[in-house]
């Protein structure tokens, strides 16, 4: 069976995702499409708008054959780690092709750039450090400066969010298994961060979440496949954002000592002190970010750091594993064919997982389900089984 892997968040699953999924199957001639998906919290450092099990249902209903959870310790980090660990999972489950959307749309350029970075690793790292020192800028900007210095302006614009992820997928594949084929298609109509829906059928997940959180589900439904609309209408819980967790974060920052926070993943350069001061003044999460941000810390980096503090995520990361959230008959057939040759631990029943393997994930789910209205999902890692569809 020919397998194609995709890395997703489906926050929520919309028409752009449906187009991407259909193209992944068609262009790679895949027998099975396997999605590695963020769980309760996503890469921008935010809570997912609905629980991971509902988003897995959306994926399966739209045609994904298997949904694997990207562990929270990787799903909520910067592009390098996010991509490395997603590719590690897809490689372990033996995908032939990694398929992704990008603003650039030419897979060969991603592969070429990744090979060049691997070949010039010392020079590239030196260029990053020079940019950090000379320009007193964020790591992301320093990385972009080093990339431009190495390749010039024209090869690949890694200031674009999907290009940077695509580049890190290519880099991870080069480092882990260069035989994984890469394919990409250009994103259509909506930019990743577009906050307004400006096309008849395609809008960014950001714009769709904005509509849903404003109580405009019917308006948002123009940009969702029928299967996603049905799941959202049947969903009985709240639609979530940082406002549902702000009081928990505020308490954590006020209650904790500065030294205690130093050991949290992503906390550096004394940023915890600014955050603790802001927590006593801010009225909401948006105020908090505005009061905390600096030239070196983008809003997204601050959100990620705030999330790690909320989750009490220590600097060490967890070991990778394959946690299956759901699969259809094709996915089950593929798993049975390859199960004996998969190098990572496979988790279908959490209670049978090796002790400590899912510790951070379980804590993240417990914190996520503190939001009012999620009582049915509390301890869901234990009582909600993988979703199996025909």
UniProtKB/Swiss-Prot annotation:
Keywords from the named record: ATP-binding, Cytoplasm, Ligase, Nucleotide-binding, RNA-binding, tRNA processing, tRNA-binding
Species of provenance: Listeria monocytogenes serotype 4a (strain HCC23)
Enzyme class: ligase
Main location: cytoplasm
UniProt key word Heme: no
Entry similarity comment: Belongs to the TmcAL family.
EC number: 6.3.4.-
Catalytic reaction annotation: cytidine(34) in elongator tRNA(Met) + acetate + ATP = N(4)-acetylcytidine(34) in elongator tRNA(Met) + AMP + diphosphate
A Pfam family per the record: HIGH_NTase1
One Gene Ontology term, aspect cellular component: cytoplasm
UniProt-recorded Gene Ontology molecular function terms: ATP binding; ligase activity, forming carbon-nitrogen bonds; tRNA binding
Alphabetized InterPro entries for the sequence: Rossmann-like_a/b/a_fold, tRNA(Met)_cyd_acetate_ligase
Domain of life the protein comes from: Bacteria
UniProt GO BP: tRNA modification
UniProt KW ATP-binding keyword: yes
Subcellular localization(s) per the UniProt record: Cytoplasm
UniProt-annotated binding residues for ATP: 7-20, 101, 162, 187
Protein name in UniProt: tRNA(Met) cytidine acetate ligase
Function of the molecule: Catalyzes the formation of N(4)-acetylcytidine (ac(4)C) at the wobble position of elongator tRNA(Met), using acetate and ATP as substrates. First activates an acetate ion to form acetyladenylate (Ac-AMP) and then transfers the acetyl group to tRNA to form ac(4)C34.
Gene that specifies this protein: tmcAL
């Amino acid at each position: 069976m020919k397998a194609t892997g995709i890395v997703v968040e489906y926050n929520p699953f919309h028409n752009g995702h449906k187009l991407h999924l259909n193209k992944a199957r068609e262009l790679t001639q895949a027998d099975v499409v396997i999605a590695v998906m963020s769980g309760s919290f996503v890469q921008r450092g935010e809570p997912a708008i609905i629980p991971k099990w509902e988003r897995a249902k959306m994926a399966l209903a739209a045609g994904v054959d298997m949904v694997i959870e990207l562990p929270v310790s990787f799903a909520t980090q910067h592009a390098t780690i996010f991509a490395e660990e997603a590719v590690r999972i897809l490689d372990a489950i033996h995908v032939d092709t990694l398929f992704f959307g990008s603003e650039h749309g030419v897979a060969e350029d991603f592969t070429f750039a990744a090979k060049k970075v691997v070949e010039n690793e010392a020079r590239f790292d030196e260029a990053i450090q020079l940019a950090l020192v000379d320009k007193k800028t964020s790591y992301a900007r320093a990385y972009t400066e080093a990339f431009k210095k190495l390749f010039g302006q024209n090869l690949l614009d890694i200031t674009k969010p999907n290009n940077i992820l695509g580049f890190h997928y290519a880099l991870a594949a080069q480092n882990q298994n260069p035989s994984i084929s890469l394919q990409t298609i250009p994103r259509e109509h909506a930019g990743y961060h577009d906050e307004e829906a400006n096309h008849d059928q395609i809008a960014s997940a950001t714009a769709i979440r904005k509509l849903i959180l404003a109580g405009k589900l019917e308006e948002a439904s123009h940009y969702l496949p029928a299967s996603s609309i049905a799941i959202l209408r049947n969903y009985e819980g709240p639609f979530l954002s940082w406002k549902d967790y702000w009081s928990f974060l505020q308490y954590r920052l006020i209650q904790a000592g500065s030294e205690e926070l130093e050991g949290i993943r992503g906390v550096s350069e004394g940023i915890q002190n600014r955050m603790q001061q802001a927590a006593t003044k801010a009225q909401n999460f948006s105020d908090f970010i505005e009061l905390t941000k600096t030239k070196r810390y983008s809003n997204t980096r601050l959100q990620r750091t705030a999330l790690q503090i909320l989750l009490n995520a220590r600097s060490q990361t967890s070991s990778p594993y394959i946690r299956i959230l759901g699969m259809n008959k094709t996915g089950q057939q593929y798993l049975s064919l390859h199960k004996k040759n998969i190098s990572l631990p496979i988790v279908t029943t959490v209670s049978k997982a090796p002790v400590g393997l899912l510790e951070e994930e379980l804590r993240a789910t417990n914190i996520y389900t503190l939001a009012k209205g999620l009582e049915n999902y509390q301890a869901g890692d234990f009582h909600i089984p993988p979703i199996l569809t025909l």
